[in-house]
Amino acid sequence: ILHSGENVNILVLDTEGYSNTGGQQSKSTPFGASMKFAIGGKNSAKKDLGMIAMMSGAYVAQIAMGANQAQAIRAFREAASFNGPSIILAYAPCIAHGFALQNGPEHQMQMVQTGAWPLFRFDPRLIDEGHNPLTMDSSVDNPMPLEDFLKTESRFGAARAANPQFNKLVDLAKANNAYKSELKKHIAQFAMLNKPVVKENGEAELWYLLHI
């Protein structure tokens, strides 16, 4: 769908697991989280759907309503006005995460502050205006310690008790968050360098500039 060019809007409610079948791990489950089929903590990175979607030329946004309502509303408006495929990734708390859901807004704020769930908007229309299409709406310059956040969810506490290598998983998670933050910036720069060039007959010609 994202590569179709059709004017469709997609909303993904990301619970970071298979919540409708009992809380099994999925490709969306983050490093170190204890889920069914990963009791000792998932030992691989969370699939970054946002980064994949950015490569398709679609409008992409990642939101957390409890952390920043204004950013979420702006993302919905931009996605609706985008003439092409758009996708919004919304963090959706789940009982399987193991925290008091009535504290959802505060919890989402903490998740954003750690850099585990960065808020951003990627609008390809800005490329035609000569602007960077990627807007980071949350700062990770001075992030909340990831370890402090993990202590608030039992899905990580269970993994800590079951896996003697849990601290290593935490280190991998922090490194992965930082890596993906930088990679998104490079993808945005790549998109700007590879905008379609219109030929005299009106057809678009796309040149890919590879940096080796």
What are these regions (language model features)?
Residues 1-14:
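A short alpha/beta connector and helix-capping loop motif
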Residues 10, 60-62, 87, 119:
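Conserved beta-strand scaffold positions in the cores of enzyme catalytic domains, especially
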Residues 12, 64-65, 90-92:
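Active-site proximal loops enriched in glycine and acidic residues that flank catalytic Cys/His/Asp
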Residues 15-20, 95-97:
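Short gly/pro/ser/thr-enriched loop/turn and capping motifs at secondary-structure boundaries
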Residues 19-29:
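Glycine-rich, charge-decorated loop segments at or immediately adjacent to ligand/cofactor-binding or catalytic sites
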Residues 27-82, 151-156:
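Conserved thiamine diphosphate
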Residues 72-171, 184, 200-204, 209:
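Glycine/aspartate-rich loop-and-adjacent alpha/beta segment that forms the canonical ThDP
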Residues 174-196, 202:
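Short, amphipathic C-terminal "tail helix"
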